[in-house]
Amino acid sequence: MKTFGSGDYRYQVVEGWGQIPQLGLVSGVACDSEDRVYVFNRSPQPAVLVFDADGTFLTSWGEGIFKHPHGIWISPDDEIFTTDRDDHTVRKFSLSGDLLMTIGTAGQAGEPGQPFNEPTRAVLSKSGQIYVSDGYGQSRVHRLTAEGGLILSWGSAGSGPGEFNLPHDVTVDRDDRVYILDRGNLRCQIFNSEGEYLTEWQDLRSPNDLFIGSDDIIHIAEGGQRVTIMTLEGEIVERWGEKGTAPGQFSDSPHGLWVDSTGDVYISEVVAERRFQKFARV
């Protein structure tokens, strides 16, 4: 079986994983504390499909809720946050799919500079505040209270520090540094919690999704059929990915990515082939 990557970061695709029923375009993936896998897809069927780590289908939920599923993220306390791009909303769910909170006005874009206009991802910081990348309709990042109240927004359209061309993903590390994948500008910008620019990483291909593990290792899903693995200091430790339709290859661009507690990597692609793959670390 072919191995992708090298050194400490070698992977083999798990062929046939999931036997996914009625899969739509897969925009995102996340795992809970038990390594159950939540596949977020655009389909007339339920938007969230749940599997165990071996690929056994467990349940589904979310039918009739979402207009355009985009980002999904699960906190260490097993709270699920989703972004619905075309509905301009962030939603919080329990693991069983109970809706706990909606932030934003369904079907209505926020005023310029205000939440939300086609948001892309929502996550929690260590202190429990919500960060949202926003998104396709405007070039902003929002920091909210745990209840959804606006604390701070920053960003504008452009290519300079603190400017964005499609902020496609937000992630916050344990020291409250905020990582924004600035997809249209082919970079990751890093800020403090007050929105002050710290630094940026370039040399990225249309970055889509960023995951920080408990070991402080970063995985980035990129356009151009690539996954980049980095340290928090920006040192690249591995890159892998091939174009194609064979198992382990990417026919388009990895769009969603998550790493479970064992180091296995799940990657989704938003393409007509409805591709979703698991890569086991070896």
Language model features with spans:
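Eukaryotic scaffold repeat domains enriched in small/polar residues
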Residues: 1-282
